[in-house]
């Protein structure tokens, strides 16, 4: 996408807009069109090139200005960037017919089948009198959901899932929310165009989104493909808009009569019109080069931020493809050379229940140990009773265990039922016998901290790095303290004596003294750490920091109303109510009061909040003693901005061990100052920011 000319909102945009009420309709219309053009360009730079040219704050102001103008002067449009936030919920997804059949592709993991495919092509083309070159286009086989995107006069008019290949679900409203799918096309595009793409959720985004779901007390998705599938078929587009979907376009279904000679020419045209394409796509001279391409992609698979399960080999020349045609099921000119499956079979030996710190019961399958993708697996989470029923899994069953990408292994299906026992979900907690409470598919123990399992998990969380980071108070130590009756409530930690701890198995006086010193050091924690340590459902380290910045002291947080909490950035109406409910609980108030009586006094939120205001940081490489997330939090809680890519708006590139070459080259290109970790820490200290 070329940079628009004479558009004032591209680089260093003026943000001191004149009041909307002072604009006439003609001026407002011109500004709306200029803003739309600029925002589309900024979306392209950010989402497809990962190289923004303005700050996030400037982008937000341009976006908000466009929203106000469209609302004030009734200039809304289905192709406006503002429409990506999602429309009204649907009653159901309609079924629509595809412009062209979306056929399956023959596939195999055997190299002999790939060579046979090439032989068939050579023989059929020779029989048809074809004398042109036989070259192949190779591309990754994405593990997502195929969609058909239809554009009329350069504007997205429809999006549909693959369905049965002839018709699929109309998911236009949801696809409009995906930033990498252009609502309007660039350049000399056909007046009518239908393309095929793959919707997916990037691996890093999947892990982060699952972490957020867990913090909110929601069920995590089992793998990126399921996350993308469930998101794309949402009836409420606003839900889709909140989830990090992405899209690659890889095929033209109808080019409006353009008649491209090769698939590589199609690939280049698609990119020029503004679609995101995968940059690994390559044209090769023969089938052996295609086989080598597959091996390269297999070797580099782990480094990709999206799931692939093989490559697709396509005949490059379109006239040759036309000669070969297709069967009812698949084209004769394409073949998928898949990777070896990351699936293994094993036997379920038992199903047990784990009780978490919130009281939630999670069934876990105990398995005969099996290696999956180089990792020995002997346990797999079954999530809830509903999943057990859907899988139909029981003790003694032979099951397939799958590890998609880098996610936690999960049971995919029952292969052979040799059931020794049927698993019945109980009505009472297996640990403390308290009644269970159901919330949809989830079950919770009502015993609270009187339940030893909940107490153990609560203490572990309190002492974890996400809490107060109390060294020496890990899972085994907590188990010993609870089993010995030394800790029956969270505040009991601060009643421990050296003599009591030293008598425990494996402990001595020195290790006991070290633990008590750690506990003493934890009595003046930063407020964000204390809030996170309490284990408030839905409140992780980031949300805790947001709350602390807003209210400043523990008393102010405890006194905050649900409405006041909902007003904090990043906290919606549901979470705001849950936080208020947590602090309204007599049980939780008593725990906090008992902690205070034992000397635990959280420090008010730091007042260095604006010390880094206006400064943008990018990090590359690993930092000693500091995760990337923690580094970002240090910057953002001090008023600065932390982004993932270097641009002209970046002030500092912080370079750790094994840094990325691309970011360093971009820093040189843009004249960005580079800092070592030591330089970065000195900069923070100079602003009074504690690390």
UniProtKB/Swiss-Prot annotation:
Keyword Kinase attributed: no
GO biological process, one term: DNA repair
Top enzyme category: ligase
Active-site residue list: 141 (n6-amp-lysine intermediate)
EC number assigned by the record: 6.5.1.2
Keywords assigned by UniProt, alphabetized: DNA damage, DNA repair, DNA replication, Ligase, Magnesium, Manganese, Metal-binding, NAD, Zinc
Domain BRCT: 607-691
Any one GO molecular-function label of the UniProt entry: metal ion binding
Keyword NAD included in the entry's annotation: yes
Residues at which Zn(2+) binds: 429, 432, 445, 451
SMART domains reported for this sequence: BRCT, HhH1, LIGANc
Pfam families: BRCT, DNA_ligase_aden, DNA_ligase_OB, HHH_2, HHH_5, Nlig-Ia
Residues noted as binding NAD(+) in the record, renumbered to the chain: 56-60, 104-105, 139, 162, 198, 314, 338
Catalytically driven reaction(s): NAD(+) + (deoxyribonucleotide)n-3'-hydroxyl + 5'-phospho-(deoxyribonucleotide)m = (deoxyribonucleotide)n+m + AMP + beta-nicotinamide D-nucleotide
Cofactors (names): Mg(2+); Mn(2+)
Source species, domain of life: Archaea
Record's function text: DNA ligase that catalyzes the formation of phosphodiester linkages between 5'-phosphoryl and 3'-hydroxyl groups in double-stranded DNA using NAD as a coenzyme and as the energy source for the reaction. It is essential for DNA replication and repair of damaged DNA.
Family statement drawn from the similarity comment of this UniProt entry: Belongs to the NAD-dependent DNA ligase family. LigA subfamily.
UniProt-listed NCBIfam families: dnlj (TIGR00575), PRK07956.1 (NF005932), PRK14351.1 (NF010931)
Protein's UniProt name: DNA ligase
Species assigned in the record: Natronomonas pharaonis (strain ATCC 35678 / DSM 2160 / CIP 103997 / JCM 8858 / NBRC 14720 / NCIMB 2260 / Gabara)
């Amino acid at each position: 996408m070329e940079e628009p000319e004479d558009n004032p909102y591209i680089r260093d945009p003026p943000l001191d807009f004149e009041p909307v009420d002072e604009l006439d309709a003609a001026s407002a219309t011109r500004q709306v069109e200029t803003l739309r053009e600029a925002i589309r360009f900024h979306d392209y730079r950010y989402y497809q090139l990962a190289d923004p040219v303005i700050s996030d704050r400037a982008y937000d102001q341009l976006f908000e200005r466009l929203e106000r103008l469209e609302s004030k002067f009734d200039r809304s449009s289905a192709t406006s960037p503002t429409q990506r936030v999602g429309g009204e919920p649907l009653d159901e997804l309609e079924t629509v017919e595809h412009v062209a059949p979306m056929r399956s592709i023959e596939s195999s993991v055997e190299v002999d089948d790939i060579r046979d495919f090439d032989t068939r092509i050579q023989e059929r083309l020779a029989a048809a009198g074809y004398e042109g070159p036989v070259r192949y286009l190779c591309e990754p086989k994405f593990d997502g959901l195929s969609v058909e995107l239809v554009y009329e006069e350069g504007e997205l008019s429809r999006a549909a899932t693959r369905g049965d290949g002839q018709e699929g679900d109309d998911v236009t409203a949801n696809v409009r929310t995906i930033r990498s799918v252009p609502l309007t096309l660039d350049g000399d595009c056909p007046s009518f165009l239908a393309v095929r793409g793959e919707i997916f959720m990037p691996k890093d985004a999947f892990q982060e989104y699952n972490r957020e779901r867990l913090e909110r007390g929601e069920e995590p998705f089992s793998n990126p493909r399921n996350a993308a599938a469930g998101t794309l078929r949402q009836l409420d587009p606003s839900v889709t808009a909140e989830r990090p979907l992405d899209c690659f376009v890889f095929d033209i279904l109808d080019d409006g009569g353009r008649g491209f000679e090769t698939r590589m020419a199609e690939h280049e045209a698609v990119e020029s019109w503004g679609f995101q394409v995968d940059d690994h796509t390559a044209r090769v001279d023969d089938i052996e080069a295609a086989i080598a391409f597959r091996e390269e992609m297999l070797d580099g698979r782990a480094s990709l931020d999206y799931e692939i399960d093989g490559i697709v080999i396509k005949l490059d020349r379109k006239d040759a493809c036309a000669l070969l045609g297709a069967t009812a099921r698949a084209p004769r000119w394409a073949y998928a050379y898949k990777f070896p499956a990351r699936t293994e079979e094993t036997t379920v030996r038992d199903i047990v229940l784990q009780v978490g710190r919130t009281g939630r019961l999670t069934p876990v399958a105990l398995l005969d140990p099996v290696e999956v993708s180089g990792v020995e697996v002997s346990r797999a989470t079954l999530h809830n009773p509903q999943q057990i029923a859907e899988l139909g899994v029981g003790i003694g069953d032979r099951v397939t265990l799958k590890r998609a990408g880098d996610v936690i292994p999960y049971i995919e299906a029952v292969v052979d039922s040799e059931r020794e026992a049927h698993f019945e979900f109980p009505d009472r907690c297996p640990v403390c016998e308290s009644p269970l409470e159901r919330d949809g598919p989830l079950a919770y123990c009502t015993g609270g901290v009187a339940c030893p399992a909940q107490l153990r998990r609560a203490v572990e969380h309190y002492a974890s790095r996400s809490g107060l980071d109390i060294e020496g108070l890990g899972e085994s130590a907590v188990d010993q303290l609870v089993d010995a009756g030394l800790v029956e409530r969270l505040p009991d930690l601060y009643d421990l004596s050296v003599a009591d701890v030293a008598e425990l198995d494996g402990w001595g006086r020195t290790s006991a003294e070290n633990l008590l010193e750690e506990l003493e050091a934890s009595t003046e924690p930063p407020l964000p750490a204390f809030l996170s340590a309490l284990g408030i459902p839905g409140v992780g380290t980031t949300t805790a920091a947001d709350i602390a910045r807003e209210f400043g002291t523990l008393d102010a947080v405890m006194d905050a109303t649900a409405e006041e909490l909902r007003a904090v950035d990043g906290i919606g109406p549901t979470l705001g109510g849950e936080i208020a409910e947590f602090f309204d609980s007599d049980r939780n108030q008593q725990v906090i009061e008992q902690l205070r009586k034992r000397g635990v006094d959280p420090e008010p939120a730091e007042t260095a909040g604006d010390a880094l205001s206006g400064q943008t940081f990018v990090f590359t490489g690993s930092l000693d003693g500091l995760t990337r997330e923690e580094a970002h939090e240090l910057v953002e809680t001090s008023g600065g901005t932390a982004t993932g890519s270097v641009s002209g708006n970046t002030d500092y590139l912080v370079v750790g061990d094994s840094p990325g070459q691309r970011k360093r080259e971009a820093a040189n290109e843009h004249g960005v100052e580079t800092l070592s970790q030591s330089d970065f820490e000195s900069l923070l200290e100079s602003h009074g920011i504690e690390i």
